[in-house]
Amino acid sequence: WAFNVITTGGAAKAYSPSGHNRFTIRQLLAPFDQTAYLCNMQYLPPFAIMGTHRLNTADIELHAVQYEQLLVALHNDRISEAEWKSVTYLNDLIPLPQSVMD
């Protein structure tokens, strides 16, 4: 597998054909998708945290827990190909915890 972990300053709506940035996140990451393809790797959707300049420390910590849970789930084969192919962002597969203790 291969996937990108990114942060953006803009909101999710900015990354669409009609948005400020004119392209989706997946379109902007197309060169990485092609590299994974050439290396015979499966390219998963990105883990993307949007609007990071508006996040406080607690929000950032929650996203860190979410990312850790994603890595554990991938490592333990708890996310199927059908599941990751059905989402725009890997974040969509792991609920954002309510606290860092979740």
Language-model segments: residues:
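Glycine-rich phosphate/pyrophosphate-binding loop and the adjoining helix
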Residues: A36-D102
